[in-house]
């Protein structure tokens, strides 16, 4: 839901929840800090707070970081969307640029580009279009009409993990919202106020949102564990290869599925792996053999705009208002904290009615 924070659809404190507040109820001690090193011989981990924690089992769940694929200018001119702070930064930049646009009475335009045609990029582009058609138009229609929104995807279609039919439907919905969708468009460099392509004319972009992909969190390199790609090398049981009692889950996990591919970096995988590792630790404690992890794919969904979404569960596919309501319900269900749920419902209701 971070993209809704960045487009002023949700308040930041409605999508974030204090970790300590959740864990205290389970009798779990929480420490905030970044790992500096792991002493594998003595089974201890040192944090940047100078605290050293001993362990019998270590579960590494560092998550992921924005992947710039070595493209020049992404770090300097692109805005990532991996946490609440980055989402707020995007919102502030868009609003600042819009206020600048309001001062002009000529044909000056504001171009906002989203790079990456996966679910994050598609949802971000759709939310920007809704922001333009709603709050910004109500604020100053003449300025809102001068906003251009681009969605740039290097591959042949957006939402490649969905069926071709649903990808086409999502692209059609974005077109109806006024988004310029550019597929088969690879980025060579991000510069100030424009995007340089490998082929074709540059795309103007006063604001560039980078949603082209993620990689394993680089902090994992400090743990002296085997790395494959950008992830921790992990066996089928989710245990780090050659390091008994050390586990890796979520985006940092480097185990592979039956097809020999890494598991997708999505929340359902992390949630299932977290529960699985808990069971594995209990199995070890009871002297039972470990069981290989098997991911249960429960489907994919993406929202494009109001009453516009796509859902795919196996061969079942759904689009339009029903898919949109299903998306709302599912995301509301997984939000932590009753206050967050109530606040999110209030934000969504207000946005829907206004």
Each language-model region and where it sits:
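Short glycine-rich anion-binding loops that position phosphate/pyrophosphate groups of nucleotides
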Residues: 63-66, 125, 214-216
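FAD-binding core/adjacent interface of flavoenzyme oxidoreductases
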Residues: 27-113, 142, 209
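N-terminal Rossmann-like dinucleotide/flavin-binding domain of flavoprotein oxidoreductases
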Residues: 1-57, 162-180
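A Rossmann-like FAD-binding core segment of flavoenzymes
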Residues: 30-37, 129-236, 240-242, 290
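Glycine-rich Rossmann-fold phosphate-binding loop(s) that bind the pyrophosphate
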Residues: 115-118, 155
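N-terminal Rossmann-fold NAD(P) dinucleotide-binding loop
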Residues: 121
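C-terminal, flexible cofactor-proximal segment of oxidoreductases
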Residues: 273, 278-354
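FAD-site-proximal beta/loop scaffold in flavoenzymes
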Residues: 76-103, 193-196, 202-272, 276-279
């Amino acid at each position: 839901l971070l993209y809704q924070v960045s487009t002023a659809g949700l308040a930041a404190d409605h999508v974030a929840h204090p970790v300590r507040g959740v864990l205290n109820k389970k009798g779990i001690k929480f420490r905030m800090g970044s790992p500096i090193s792991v002493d594998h011989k003595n089974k201890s981990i040192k944090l940047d707070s100078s605290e050293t924690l001993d362990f019998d089992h270590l579960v590494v769940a560092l998550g992921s970081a924005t992947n710039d694929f070595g493209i020049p200018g992404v770090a300097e001119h692109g805005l990532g969307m991996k946490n609440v702070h980055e989402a707020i930064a995007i919102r502030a930049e868009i609003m600042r640029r819009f206020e600048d646009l309001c001062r002009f009475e000529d044909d000056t335009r504001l171009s906002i580009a989203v790079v990456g045609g996966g679910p994050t990029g598609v949802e971000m582009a759709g939310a920007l279009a809704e922001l333009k058609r709603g709050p910004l138009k109500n604020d100053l229609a003449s300025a809102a009409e001068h906003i251009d929104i681009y969605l740039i995807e290097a591959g042949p279609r957006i939402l490649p993990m969905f069926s071709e039919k649903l990808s086409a439907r999502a692209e059609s919905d974005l077109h109806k919202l006024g988004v310029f969708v550019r597929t088969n468009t690879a980025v060579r460099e991000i510069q100030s106020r424009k995007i340089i392509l490998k082929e074709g004319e540059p795309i103007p972009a006063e604001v560039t949102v980078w949603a082209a992909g993620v990689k394993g969190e680089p902090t994992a390199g400090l743990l002296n564990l085997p790395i494959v790609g950008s992830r921790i090398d992990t066996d089928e049981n989710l245990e780090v290869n050659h390091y008994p009692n050390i586990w890796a889950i979520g985006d940092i996990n480097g185990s592979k599925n039956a097809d020999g591919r890494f598991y997708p970096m999505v929340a359902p995988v992390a949630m299932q792996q977290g529960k699985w590792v808990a069971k594995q630790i209990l199995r070890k404690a009871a002297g039972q053999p470990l069981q290989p992890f098997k991911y249960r794919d429960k489907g994919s969904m993406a929202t494009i705009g109001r009453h516009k979404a796509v859902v795919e569960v196996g061969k079942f596919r759904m689009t339009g208002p029903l898919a949109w309501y299903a998306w709302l319900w599912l995301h509301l269900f997984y939000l932590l904290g009753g206050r967050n749920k109530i606040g999110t419902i209030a934000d969504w209701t207000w946005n829907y009615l206004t």
